[in-house]
UniProtKB/Swiss-Prot annotation:
Gene (UniProt): petA
Keyword terms: Chloroplast, Electron transport, Heme, Iron, Membrane, Metal-binding, Photosynthesis, Plastid, Signal, Thylakoid, Transmembrane, Transmembrane helix, Transport
Record GO biological process: photosynthesis
Cofactor: heme
Protein name as annotated: Cytochrome f
Quaternary context: The 4 large subunits of the cytochrome b6-f complex are cytochrome b6, subunit IV (17 kDa polypeptide, petD), cytochrome f and the Rieske protein, while the 4 small subunits are PetG, PetL, PetM and PetN. The complex functions as a dimer.
Cofactor binding mode and count: Binds 1 heme group covalently.
Biological role stated in the UniProt entry: Component of the cytochrome b6-f complex, which mediates electron transfer between photosystem II (PSII) and photosystem I (PSI), cyclic electron flow around PSI, and state transitions.
Annotated family: Belongs to the cytochrome f family.
A GO term, aspect molecular function: electron transfer activity
Transmembrane segments: 286-306
Keyword Flavoprotein annotated: no
Residue ranges the record marks as coiled coil: none
């Protein structure tokens, strides 16, 4: 009897532990998966400004390359791949929010023409699903299905991101046409330097807010520094707070100027944007082109046969 009660108690404890762990995973997982898109989604109605600049560059200040590969042309109602490449040195480590070093994450925003959208799961081939992996894409806005975002995701695994895209059918969507369309992409690796509210992250350089002498440097218990700058003529003191992460470049007694860097710049990531073009091809135009090419080939064949027949007639007349 006692053994049965003990086993029952152990079973309840295990069930409770699993439930708590699952809740923590869901909460933290949701936060991580929404961290990159929510920054832009909360602050901007459209991720691409009128100047062509993608708004992610407002927080990720360093300029880095990004690449995109799409088919030259696609037929209506067809699933195709848009491959975004975010290259960087896999050996690099970035400063995390707690000041420690860790691996870089990546994220991307893909701005498609109106009518193009994320392909439904039942339209994606097994080969394409294998390329996509465990990535979960989402629309920038419920009404903007042509703008897709992803991230942050581990950069070492997803420096190349495959988006499954469904092309529109002008026969069903009257506002789409058989034309050449632009596609815009933005991709970042690593954390940003500025938060959406304008405040600095710990992944950037910190400058002196006043000129004077560094009279005191206090190392905080949780990391970072408090630097006291004393203005010699007036004796006014200014305290600059440095979060954990950046390395200190100044020492006590040193004379510094306004806006002089107090720390190194720990940022190893950056943001880049690019574009590509894709043609929504009319199937009738393709069929017409094939018919034209076939007719040209047949005409050439008949011309050769006619020429040989004429040569035979000439040869027979000469022999006669």
């Amino acid at each position: 009897m006692q053994t049965r009660k003990t086993l029952s108690w152990i079973k309840e404890e295990i069930t409770r532990s699993i439930s708590v762990s699952l809740m923590i995973y869901i909460i933290t997982g949701a936060y991580i998966s929404n961290a990159y898109p929510i920054f832009a989604q909360q602050g901007y109605e459209n991720p691409r400004e009128a100047t062509g600049r993608i708004v992610c560059a407002n927080c990720h200040l360093a300029n880095k390359p990004v690449g995109i590969e799409v088919p030259q042309a696609v037929l209506p109602d067809t699933v195709f791949e848009a491959v975004v490449r975010i290259p960087y040195d896999m050996q690099l480590k970035q400063v995390l929010a707690n000041g420690k070093k860790g691996a870089l994450n990546v994220g991307a925003v893909l701005i498609l023409p109106e009518g193009f959208e994320l392909a439904p799961p039942d339209r994606i081939s097994p080969e394409m699903k294998e390329k996509i992996g465990n990535l979960s894409f989402q629309s920038y806005r419920p009404a903007k299905k042509n703008i897709l975002v992803i991230g942050p995701v581990p950069g070492q695994k997803y420096s190349e991101i495959t988006f499954p895209i469904l092309s529109p059918d002008p026969a069903a969507k009257k506002d789409t046409h058989f034309l050449k369309y632009p596609i815009y992409v933005g991709g970042n690796r690593g954390r940003g330097q500025i938060y959406p509210d304008g405040s600095k992250s710990n992944n950037t350089v910190y400058n002196a807010t006043a000129a004077g002498i560094v009279s005191k440097i206090i190392r905080k218990e949780k990391g970072g520094y408090e630097i006291t700058i004393t203005d010699a003529p007036e004796g006014r003191q200014v305290i600059d707070s440095i979060p954990p992460g950046p390395e200190l470049l100044v020492s006590e007694g040193e004379s510094i100027k306004l806006d002089q860097p107090l720390t190194s710049n720990p940022n190893v990531g950056g943001f880049g944007q690019g574009d590509a073009e894709i043609v929504l091809q009319d199937p009738l135009r393709v069929q017409g082109l094939l018919f034209f090419l076939a007719s040209v080939i047949l005409a050439q064949i008949f011309l050769v046969l006619k020429k040989k027949q004429f040569e035979k007639v000439q040869l027979s007349e000469m022999n006669f």
